[in-house]
Amino acid sequence: MIESTDADLAWLLPDEAATAALAAHMAGVLDDGLVLYLHGPLGAGKTSFARALLTALDVGERVKSPTYSLIEGYATRDRPAWHLDLYRIADPGELEWLGLDALADPAALVLVEWPERGAGALPTADLELLLGYAGQGRRASLRAFTAKGERLLARLAKY
């Protein structure tokens, strides 16, 4: 961890292995459902983080990028998980046919890349992860928006 405030945490991640380690740490302290919005430019590591988090939660199958399918569902060791990539969505109304009702399950892990493209159609984020370029590596910052997100942030602060 490189910095901390009451509302957020930040890390410098020198490589993809460090990104995967942060995701694995999150998986280890996750004890409830969570809605996590993933922000960052193309190639910043949103899908890599989501893939590492789902893998650490023992999905037991290859974690695919939902770039073309828009949504992929998984069963982790103790909860349903959904990974959405809304990059190709031009209007949130396009999400109506996806049947997003399952995302409201409080036990579910919901990972959303490009959430701004689904504004108004998505559940509220507990946490948001902002990934950006930092030299050859990445800078990751997490911000909490709910009590659930704040509890997870407190557990992650020990990383």
What are these regions (language model features)?
Residues 1-9, 55, 90-95, 101-159:
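Short phosphate-coordinating micro-motif centered on Lys-Gly-acidic
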Residues 2-25:
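N-terminal pre-Walker A segment at the start of P-loop NTPase domains
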Residues 26-33:
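Phosphate-binding P-loop
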Residues 35-37:
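Short hydrophobic/aromatic beta-strand immediately N-terminal to the Walker A/P-loop
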Residues 39-41:
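P-loop (Walker A) phosphate-binding loop of NTP-binding proteins
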Residues 46:
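Conserved lysine of the Walker
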Residues 59-74:
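Short beta-strand-centered segment that lines the nucleotide-binding/catalytic pocket of NTP-utilizing
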